[in-house]
């Protein structure tokens, strides 16, 4: 093997299409665009969803649903995430300070997910039935 004998393996390099460069290339004259029509012209294209003037499907089908504004101010927090915190008394301010929830969140619900490792006191937070049982069985309290 010498430097002058090195060449790329077969099929690894492909020549680009040279459009409009003679009849023998296979892409001469019309350059692969066919004859006439909007798509053969320069700058000639149709917008996404255009169906030739027919009412497009995205306008034929009715709108449905909505985006709730409540989801921007509510959050669910796992019990396992809370048990990793250094403090025993947990409220909205603590969760925001520890970057568990966003600063815009106003309502939090604690859900049972993972293991509880310490006795916690929750203040002013909503709790699911399973999470409540887990906290109380471990010696924790839920206030307010």
Swiss-Prot record:
Q: Where is this region: Disordered?
A: 1-51
The keyword rRNA-binding belongs to this UniProt entry's keyword annotation:
yes
One GO cellular component term of this record is:
cytosolic large ribosomal subunit
For bias kind Polar residues, which ranges apply? 1-12
Which GO molecular function terms does the record list?
A: rRNA binding; structural constituent of ribosome
Q: What InterPro entries does the record point to?
A: Ribosomal_uL15, Ribosomal_uL15/eL18, Ribosomal_uL15/eL18_sf, Ribosomal_uL15_bac-type, Ribosomal_uL15_CS
Pfam families recorded? Ribosomal_L27A
Question: Which biological process annotations from GO are given for this protein?
Answer: translation
Q: Where is the composition biased (Gly residues)?
A: 21-31
Keywords from the UniProt entry: Ribonucleoprotein, Ribosomal protein, RNA-binding, rRNA-binding
Q: Which family does it belong to?
A: Belongs to the universal ribosomal protein uL15 family.
Q: Write out the function statement from the record.
A: Binds to the 23S rRNA.
| Alphabetized HAMAP family for the sequence | Ribosomal_uL15
UniProt subunit comment: Part of the 50S ribosomal subunit.
**What name does this protein carry?**
Large ribosomal subunit protein uL15
């Amino acid at each position: 093997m010498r430097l002058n004998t090195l060449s790329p393996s077969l099929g690894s390099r492909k020549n680009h299409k040279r459009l409009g460069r003679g009849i023998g290339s296979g892409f001469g004259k019309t350059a692969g665009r066919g004859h006439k029509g909007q798509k053969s012209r320069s700058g000639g294209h149709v917008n996404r969803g255009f169906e030739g003037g027919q009412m497009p499907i995205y306008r034929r089908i009715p709108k449905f649903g909505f985006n709730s504004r409540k989801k921007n101010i509510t959050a669910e927090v796992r019990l396992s995430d809370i048990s990793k915190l250094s403090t025993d008394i947990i409220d909205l301010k603590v969760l925001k300070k520890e970057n568990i929830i966003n600063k815009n969140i106003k309502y939090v619900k604690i859900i049972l997910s993972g293991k509880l490792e310490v006795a916690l006191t929750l203040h002013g937070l909503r709790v699911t039935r399973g999470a409540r049982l887990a906290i109380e069985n471990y010696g924790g309290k839920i206030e307010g």
